């Protein structure tokens, strides 16, 4: 009887160890999506910088192009974000990837807010409102999904990051569209302006 129990120990160890190991097959697609969002957000920020230097219709077009591309990247991130709770190791990897995106989004929203009058003067008020609404809605959904799948020990820092991103998106949406959320309320996922 004793030897039968000993024979089962390696199996129990392997099953337990497997559940504790990071599942890179789950987190890599999300990190790739975050990397793509970051790259596209930087391209959008560069387009904003170019438009600021030369506010013409030709320079406004890349802003629209990269704005819609960023919304597409965010949607891809929503699609690959797992619904199961990640391990601590996977959540740490995800959190580190999100820190870079957070910094980029801060700079991007600052640029977008600064250019509002010039973009409206170029005749892109309706398109800008639509693009910002789509981005705010998608980013809210993405951050909510990331928060939901994260390990408990990262919930605090992720909630701060999520609130920061949602506040930035709400500010941009309010600036361009006059409402905080696409449905006209003064809230985006619990964040008020």
Swiss-Prot record:
Superkingdom, taxonomy of origin: Eukaryota
UniProt key word Protein transport: no
Location, primary (coarse class): secreted
Keywords, alphabetical: Cell wall, Glycoprotein, Secreted, Signal
Modifications made to the protein after synthesis: Galactomannoprotein, glycosylated.
Glycosylation: residue positions: 38, 173
Signal peptide: 1-17
GO cellular component: extracellular region
Subcellular location: Secreted, Cell wall
Induction or repression: Shows high expression in fruiting bodies and is highly expressed throughout development.
Protein task: Constitutive protein of the cell wall.
Further information: Armillaria species are both devastating forest pathogens and some of the largest and oldest terrestrial organisms on Earth. They forage for hosts and achieve immense colony sizes via rhizomorphs, root-like multicellular structures of clonal dispersal. An A.ostoyae colony, known as the 'humongous fungus' in the Malheur National Forest in the Strawberry Mountains of eastern Oregon, was found to be the largest fungal colony in the world, spanning an area of 9.1 square kilometers. This organism is estimated to be some 8,000 years old and may weigh as much as 35,000 tons.
Family membership: Belongs to the cell wall mannoprotein 1 family.
Protein name (database record): Cell wall galactomannoprotein
Species annotation: Armillaria ostoyae (Armillaria root rot fungus)
């Amino acid at each position: 009887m004793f030897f039968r129990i000993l024979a089962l120990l390696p199996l129990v160890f392997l099953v337990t160890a497997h559940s504790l190991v990071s599942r890179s097959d789950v987190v890599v697609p999300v990190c790739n999506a975050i990397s793509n969002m970051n790259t596209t957000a930087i391209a959008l920020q560069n387009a904003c910088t170019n438009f600021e230097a030369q506010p013409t219709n030709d320079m406004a077009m890349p802003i629209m192009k990269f704005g819609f591309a960023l919304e597409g990247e965010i949607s891809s991130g929503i699609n690959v974000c797992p619904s199961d709770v990640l391990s601590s190791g996977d959540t740490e990897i995800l959190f580190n990837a999100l820190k870079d995106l957070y910094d980029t989004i801060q700079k991007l929203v600052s640029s977008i807010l600064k250019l509002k009058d010039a973009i409206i003067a170029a005749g892109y008020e309706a398109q800008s409102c639509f693009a910002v609404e789509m981005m705010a809605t998608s980013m809210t959904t993405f951050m909510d999904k990331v928060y939901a799948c994260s390990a408990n020990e990262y919930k605090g820092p992720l909630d701060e990051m999520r609130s920061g991103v949602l506040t930035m998106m709400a500010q941009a949406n309010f600036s361009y569209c006059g409402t905080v959320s696409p449905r006209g309320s003064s809230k985006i996922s619990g964040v008020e302006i």
